[in-house]
């Protein structure tokens, strides 16, 4: 799995109830044809990334088929989750 691009938006907390900053990432994912996640239309990953003081984490995510926006029922493997977390840390500024 390779991340080839992204869109990011900082989410606003209108009531100030949540600590830290939240970002919504739409990651463009390149997947090998042999991978069960592969789709001819392409695959994306929506991520809610939270940065709170020294703690960065992925709050939620899901894979989707680009074009149809159909949600795909897959989970990130541990190494992939680290890759996504690192990517979000590096690209969080809008």
Segments (PLM) and residue ranges:
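A short hydrophobic beta-strand element
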Residues: 21-29
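Short, solvent-exposed beta-strand/turn "edge" segments of beta-rich domains on protein surfaces
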Residues: 12-22, 35-38
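Compositionally biased, intrinsically disordered low-complexity regions
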Residues: 7, 18, 22, 44-46, ...
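Short, cysteine-centered beta-strand-loop-beta hairpins and adjacent loop/turn segments enriched
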Residues: 30-43
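Generic alpha-helix detector with strongest preference for long hydrophobic helices that associate
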Residues: 4, 8, 30, 61, ...
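Beta-strand elements of well-folded, non-transmembrane domains
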Residues: 7, 12, 29-33, 49-53, ...
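Short amphipathic beta-strand and strand-loop transition segments with alternating hydrophobic
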Residues: 1-17
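Acidic, low-complexity intrinsically disordered segments
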Residues: 44-94
């Amino acid at each position: 799995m390779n991340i080839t691009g992204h869109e990011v938006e900082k989410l606003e907390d209108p009531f100030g109830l949540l600590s830290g900053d939240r970002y919504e990432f739409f990651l463009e994912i390149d997947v090998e044809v042999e991978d069960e996640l592969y789709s001819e239309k392409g695959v994306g990953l929506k991520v809610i990334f939270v940065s709170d003081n020294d703690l960065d984490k992925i709050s939620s995510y899901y894979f989707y088929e680009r074009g149809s926006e159909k949600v795909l029922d897959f989970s990130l493997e541990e190494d992939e989750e680290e890759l996504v977390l690192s990517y979000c840390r590096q690209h969080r500024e809008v």
